[in-house]
């Protein structure tokens, strides 16, 4: 899908999960991706192996530097993305190494589908980022092909790449799992994903469903269904979409020992806690913190209550 006159740099925009972000689009004029995801809001496009239109790295660097110099408000993060997959950009390492020196107190983030993490050149570039967010919508091969419609269907190679990168990466590794009703929300697929993410140093799992117009017909999960799916990710910091007022009224009442057991199974986001815990249960959090039975872990702009 061609897009005319779209800027390379956009924002700042406020991200609930990462704070105030200035975005950088490595493919502003055209969708260039090795996936053709069922939920993609950019429209349908044939998946490609390599970028066909490549912006000069010097152009990107000067454009980013100019945008940073003209900011009127502070930002938390510089986000590298694309109308497609940013790790397809052949000069990614040079780009990130060139812009980091003039980022003062600003974290760097890249949004990727994770498909090329096995490539040494891609790994070298990704190591330079403070936060790497990758997608993992399916491990079950049939679900993977239906959801992501990839150029390469070698899911094992993709998983090996993510695993090997996680072993050398020192920053925050965030996984995104987008679920579509009747496609990749089976117990088998969820267990496969959760088991894999527990093997790697995943700082946070962003679990979501369809919330925007997509390329193909893609039914969304309800808030209750998404919450049930999150139970598969026991022991991981899971971020769910912000709850509606109706959902927020369903408060949990529990004693301090029950609350500690709950947090031991699944870390609780600080944003979610006042929405799902009744006032008495919410007060137990302070007691558990004071007794050093739980701690607060920050991932991006989100905080989680975690057991020691």
UniProtKB/Swiss-Prot annotation:
Domain of life, source organism: Bacteria
Positions annotated to bind [4Fe-4S] cluster: 33, 37, 40
Name of the protein described by the UniProt record: UPF0026 protein jhp_0109
Cofactor or coenzyme needed: [4Fe-4S] cluster
Radical SAM core domain mapped to chain residues: 18-247
PROSITE patterns, alphabetized: RADICAL_SAM
Cofactor binding description: Binds 1 [4Fe-4S] cluster. The cluster is coordinated with 3 cysteines and an exchangeable S-adenosyl-L-methionine.
Gene3D superfamilies assigned to the protein according to its UniProt record, in alphabetical order: Aldolase class I (3.20.20.70)
Family designation: Belongs to the UPF0026 family.
Keywords assigned: 4Fe-4S, Iron, Iron-sulfur, Metal-binding, S-adenosyl-L-methionine
């Amino acid at each position: 899908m061609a897009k005319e006159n779209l800027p390379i740099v956009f924002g700042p925009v406020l991200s609930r999960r990462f704070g105030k972000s200035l975005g950088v689009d490595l493919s502003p004029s055209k969708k260039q991706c090795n996936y053709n995801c069922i939920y993609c809001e950019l429209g349908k496009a044939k998946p490609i192996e390599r970028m066909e239109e490549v912006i000069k790295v010097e152009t990107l660097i000067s454009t980013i530097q100019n945008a940073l110099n003209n900011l009127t408000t502070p930002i938390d993060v510089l986000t590298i993305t694309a109308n497609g997959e940013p790790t397809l950009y052949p000069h990614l390492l040079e780009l990130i190494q060139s812009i980091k020196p003039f980022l003062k107190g600003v974290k760097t983030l890249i949004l990727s589908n994770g498909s090329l993490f096995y490539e040494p050149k891609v790994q070298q570039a990704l190591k330079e980022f403070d936060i790497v967010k990758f997608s993992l919508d399916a491990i079950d091969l049939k679900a993977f092909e239906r959801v992501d419609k990839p150029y390469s269907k070698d899911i094992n190679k993709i998983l090996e790449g993510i695993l090997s990168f996680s072993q050398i990466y020192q920053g925050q590794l965030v996984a995104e799992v987008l679920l579509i009703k009747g496609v990749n929300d089976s117990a088998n697929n969820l267990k496969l994903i959760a088991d894999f993410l527990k093997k790697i140093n995943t700082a946070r799992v962003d679990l979501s469903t369809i919330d925007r117009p997509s390329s193909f017909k893609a039914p969304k999960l309800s808030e209750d269904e998404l919450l049930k799916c999150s139970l598969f990710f026991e022991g991981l910091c899971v971020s769910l979409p912000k709850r509606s007022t109706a959902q927020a009224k369903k408060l949990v009442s529990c004693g301090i020992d029950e609350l500690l057991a709950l947090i031991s199974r699944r870390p609780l986001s600080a944003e979610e806690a006042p929405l799902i815990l009744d006032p008495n249960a919410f007060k137990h959090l302070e007691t558990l913190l004071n007794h050093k039975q739980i701690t607060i872990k920050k991932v991006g702009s989100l905080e989680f209550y975690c057991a020691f």
